[in-house]
A protein has these predicted regions:
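Nucleotidyltransferase catalytic core that binds NTPs
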Residues: 1-128
Length: 128
């Protein structure tokens, strides 16, 4: 079975996250997910974030059918180390990363881009 990788904050799961997971699982049977640590989410998203702790986010994702394993990473080096160990067949990432450096891409056999679903973002939901 193919190993498929996605990563992100996944702070408050919404429709866009589920579409990403559905898209990624279409490439193979084993979906591995990396999530940013609480410290990293706060650095990326600002004060008041994350809404859910890393352990809560990990648990929520592990409850989704098709998710094989969820990893929490605190640094880019840790993310690279996880990807080097897993060596995914497919690395799925948002299409906003086309022509941008992708951390750990060198460990994947193939990169697939996912077009984000307009109007769905955790930040947008929390700001409402």
């Amino acid at each position: 079975m193919k190993k498929v990788w996605i990563n992100g904050c996944f702070d408050v799961l919404h429709h866009g996250h589920f579409k990403l997971i559905q898209y990624a699982t279409g490439f193979g049977g084993n979906l591995f997910i990396g999530i940013d640590s609480d410290k990293r989410v706060k650095q990326l998203k600002g004060e008041g974030r994350p809404f859910h702790t890393a352990l809560q986010r990990k648990y929520n994702l592990e409850c989704i059918l098709g998710v094989r394993q969820v990893f929490i990473f605190d640094t880019e080096e840790q993310l690279r180390g996880i990807l080097e160990t897993i060596k995914p067949d497919v690395f799925v990432i948002g299409s906003d990363y086309i022509d941008k450096p992708i951390i750990g891409a060198e460990f994947a056999k193939e990169i697939k881009f996912f077009d984000r679903i307009g109007g769905f973002s955790t930040t947008g939901l929390l700001d409402e």
